[in-house]
Amino acid sequence: MATKNSKQNMSVLLTKLGDRDTFTMAARELDLMARQIDPSSSSGNLQSFISVILSVDTGDKPAVRKHCIHLLAVLSVSLPLNSLSPFLSKILTRITRRLRDPDSSIRSTCVAAVSAISSRTTKPPFYSAFMKPLADTLFTEQEVNAQIGAALCLAAAIDSASDPDPVRLGQTLLPRLEKLVKCNAFKAKSAGVVVIGSVIGAGGLSGTSVSSGGLKGLVDCLLSFLVSEDWAARKAAAEALGRLATMERNELGEFKAKCLKIFESRKYDKVKAVREVMNQMMEAWKQVPDLSEEVSPPRSNASSKGDASDGRYPSGSRVGSTPAKSRTHLVNRSTPPGSSLATTARKQANRKSIDQKKTSLTASLTKPNVRRRLEWKAGGASIPTGVSLEDEQHCDHDENAKETSHSSHNTVQKLGGVSSSLNGNIPPSGATMVTGHHVLSENPNSNNCKGLEDISLIRNQLVQIEQQQANLMDLLQRFVGSSQHGMRGLETRVHGLELALDEISYDLAVSNGRMSNGSSRNNCCLLPSGSFIKSKFWKKHDSKYSASRMSTYRNRNAETTEIQNSRHRFNGSPGFIVNPLAEIRPDNDLQVCLTIEGRRETKPSKASETLKTTV
C-alpha cells in the first residue's frame, strides 16, 4: 500500500515538473524523497522510485527528462556504496537512450549522472559495469549526438572510478580509440580524444608495456589534432598531451624537441580556453628530461686514471661519463696533447693547481665565450690559444656566474671536436677533451645551442614583425596619397563648376546689355578650358565670342588661370565678386513672362527677345 502511494505521489510530482510555475517546488520534493530512501528496507521504495524515474520517455517535456536523470545522481550520492549495483545495467541502458536527445543539457546531465554513479560503485568490476556497455555504444552508434554523449560518459566514468582497471584500458580500449578517431565516419572526434586523455590519466600506458612504436603512434595521433579546425578537438588534444607528459615523462625524451617546436607554433590559439590549456601542457613537457639527462652518474676519479696514463693531466680534474641508456646515443671526442688548445689548457692547469678545486665548472665557459667560439667556427679558423683563453674565462666568470655546469660541459666538448677537426687529420679517441683546467664530456643536446636556436627564432620573429609594420606603413602612405589625389580632383571639379557659372553669368549679362565687352573682363572670371563644362551647358556652338575665348584659354596652364581668375574676380583689390545680373536698374522695362499650359504670353520687350534668343 505504501509503495502504491509512493508511486502515485511521484507521478503527481513528475506532472508538476512539466509546469514552469510548479517546477521548483516539485524538484525540491523529489530531491528530498530521493535522499530519504532507505535501501535496506524491505518495502521496495528504492526499486519503485527507480522504476518510476526510468519510465519517463521522449514524450515528456525536456525539463522532466533532465530532472529524472539528475535524480539518479542524487540517489548515488545519498545512498551507501554499491546501492545502485543491482540496477546498474538498466540505468545505463536508459541513459544511453537519452544520449540521442538533441538537447545538449540532457546529455550533460547524463555525463554528470554516470560520473556520480561510477564514483560510488566498486562492484561489479569497472570493465563489466561501465567500460563494456559504454564502449559498445561509442563504437556502434552512428548518430553524432549519441557518439558525443557516449564518449563523454565513458571519459567521466574512467575519471571518477576508484579502480578503472588501467591494464585493460591500455591493452583493449586505447588501440581501438586511436583507430576510431582516425576514421572519417566518426564525427565526434573531439569527444574521442577526451576519452584518450582519460585513459592516459588513469595510467593506461604505465599499466602495460607499450612499445616505442606504439607510443610514437599515440603522440603523432594527438599532434595531428592540434591543427584541427575544431577548437574543442585542439583543447582535448592539448589536455591529453599534458597528461601524457605527466604520467610518462621518462619515456618521452626522444619526442621532446619535436613536440616543443610544434607547441611553440600553436600556442597562440585564437580561443582563450585552448591557449590556457596549451600553456599548461607546454610547462608539463618542459619537465620531460632530455636524452642527455638520461645518462647515469659520472665515474669516480680513480676509474679515470687509465685515460691519463701519460701523467700530463692532473688528477681530480676529469669528469667522465658512463654509457647512456638504450635510447641515448653519445659520440665522445678528445683533443690530443699535440693540439694548441690542449697545450694551453695543460699550461693553465699547472699554473693554477690551487685555484682548480675552488673554481666551479660554471665559471669556465659562459655565453660570450660560446658566442666567440661559434664565430671562430663559422669563420673556418682554429680557436686562438695562449693567454687570451685565460682572460676570457676570468671575464666570463665575473659576468655569468649562474651558467649551469651541464650546458658548459656540452658546449666545450662540441667546440673541442671542431677544434680537433680543424687542426688536421686527428683520429677521435676516448671520451674526453681538455679546456682550461677541466676535462669535459661531449653532449650533442647542448642547452647553450638550444638557447642560441631560441635567440635565432626570436630574431626571425622580430624581423617578421618589422616587415609587417613596414607593409602597414606603405599601405597607410598609399591610402593617404590616394586621399590627397581624390581631394585635388574634387577641388579641380568644384573650381571648374565655379568657372562655368561665371561664364554663364557673363553670357547672360552680355546678352542683356548690362555690361559692355570691354568691362566684362574685369567683372567676370573667364573659363580656362572647355573640358570643365559638359555639352549640356552649351546651347549654341556657333558663338564667335565663346569660340574665340575657348581657343584663347585652352593652351594656358592652371597657375596662369588661377592668377587671372583672382584678378578678374576681385578687380585687383579686396572685395566680393560682383554678379551683373544682381544689379537692379529702375529704368529697365524688361518683362519676363512665363508661359504655363494655355496662358497667353505677354508681348515681350526688345530686351526679353534677346534673352530668349541667347538661352
Swiss-Prot record:
Gene3D superfamilies: Leucine-rich Repeat Variant. Keywords: Phosphoprotein, Repeat. Residues 318-347, 407-426 have a biased composition (Polar residues). It comes from the Eukaryota. HEAT repeats lie at residues 44-81, 86-123, 125-163, 168-205, 213-250. Residues 391-406 have a biased composition (Basic and acidic residues). One of its GO terms (molecular function) is microtubule binding. This is TORTIFOLIA1-like protein 3. It comes from Arabidopsis thaliana.
